[in-house]
Amino acid sequence: MSSKWITSLFKSVILTAALASSFAASAFTEGTDYMVLEKPIPNADKTLIKVFSYACPFCYKYDKAVTGPVSEKVADLVTFTPFHLETKGEYGKQASEVFAVMIAKDQAAGISLFDAKSQFKKAKFAYYAAYHDRKERWSDGKDPAAFIKTGLDAAGMSQADFDAALQDPTVQQTLEKWKAAYDVAKIQGVPAYVVNGKYLIYTKSIKSIDSMAELVRELATK
């Protein structure tokens, strides 16, 4: 086997690899798969934010089948960070308060938000199931106590403990931070996935869990 042939083969392999790399780099395009937010979410580096609402049917569907698997595939690059949208649903404000408290409890206990023991997960899916599966409306905004009780019962928390936890500075900071969810949600609705606070993924372009994870990985390293 001649050295000239080996050199030619080596160059061919290098060219093929370069073309493959170039193709991979251009597999996702701005304006088709994602957009750059004009107003980035502050202090969101190395995060995969999901803006959601308990009253959003697609948020429920994505949380059942997509959010967890994608977050697991990109956990080495970004941390999953839920942002509840206070402005959607009759009880958006109350839901945000319940979720912020439960997230703080999970974080203090070192429990993943995807773990079966997560109080956030228990409350979230209790609301999803009640609202979307059983069509519960809690008197259409006239019974906030009943709405809150649904989440607290699922998470195993008393009203007194909830009231006390709600005053925690960490919880209040979370609620303040979540106000940025509105500007993101009004672009294409919810759910809305944002990488590093800058890149909004177009949900209509998501083809599979693997392709979404690949997109998140690409955006996370920009």
Region locations from a protein language model:
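Extracytoplasmic thiol/disulfide redox context detector
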Residues: 2-93, 173, 179, 184, ...
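Compositionally biased, intrinsically disordered low-complexity regions enriched in proline and serine
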Residues: 24, 29, 35, 129-132, ...
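Catalytic His-Asp charge-relay segment
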Residues: 49, 192-193
